[in-house]
Amino acid sequence: MANVEEKKNELDDKKIFTSNAQRTTTVAKGETIIELKDVTIRFNKNNLKVDNLKEYFIRLVTKQLMFQEFIALKDINLDIKKGEAWGFLGTNGAGKSTLLKVVSRILKPASGTVKVSGTVAALIELGAGIDPQLTARENIFLNGTLLGYSKAFIESKFDDIVEFSELQDFLDSPVKNFSSGMKTRLAFSIATAVEPDILIADEILAVGDMRFKKKCAAKMTAMLEDGTTLLYVSHNIAAVKKQCNKAMWLDHGNVVMVGDADTVCDAFKAEMDAPAPAKTQSKDKK
């Protein structure tokens, strides 16, 4: 009987997802679903102004093409259980978005290992996966395909996506004419059409009206109750406290603190509220 049930679930997954990487995880609630060990991300920062291919190749051949190494994340260790809600705090450039891109399989670490199980719906950048030249209707199918959904599944969820996004009157309008809030509605509605094992939201809900933000927060809460794992980045500390039970504070690619959301948020807020150190004034020349 158990084998029959497993076979049925596998068939259901095949109707929804076109990629094996997007099939539902077998990880039980409370077990590790995301594991990062000693993850380091390096970027090459080019300070030279090279504006054509000829100059680029000349510098490359003559070994005059110099890069400065930039460490975006350094030796990050993270163990996230299925069903947990994690908030990531830090100032701009701390490495929060980079960390989420690692989990989303967008970036490959220079060193360390990353293990992610199950389906991932990533809302990392406003407009990512959305073609501004296409209509909202066409983008629902395009974005859904990029997330690994089958055409049959997108068609079955089409009305639900449109209803949640509240874009009924703009379905056949080019997305390039949409406001930032309308793009957010569209992207969030598509990403949450099926409850993923892991939902990643990176400051995408910073735009949009208050009513839709509350609607999205309620949707995320419902998904958490059903076992979805949440990775959430926001500069709104109150929102992180409300939505998450765990938090990580990053600063220039390094981990400052990891723990329960209230403790980490309070420590981060205290640091941000502290007066800036006074600038040392140079002594007057005699």
Regions found by a protein language model. Give the residues of each.
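H-loop (His-switch) and adjacent beta-strand-loop-beta switch element
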Residues: 243-260, 268
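Conserved ABC ATPase "signature" region
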Residues: 54-61, 141, 153-170
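Pre-NBD coupling/linker segments of ABC/ABC-like ATPases
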Residues: 2-72, 261-283
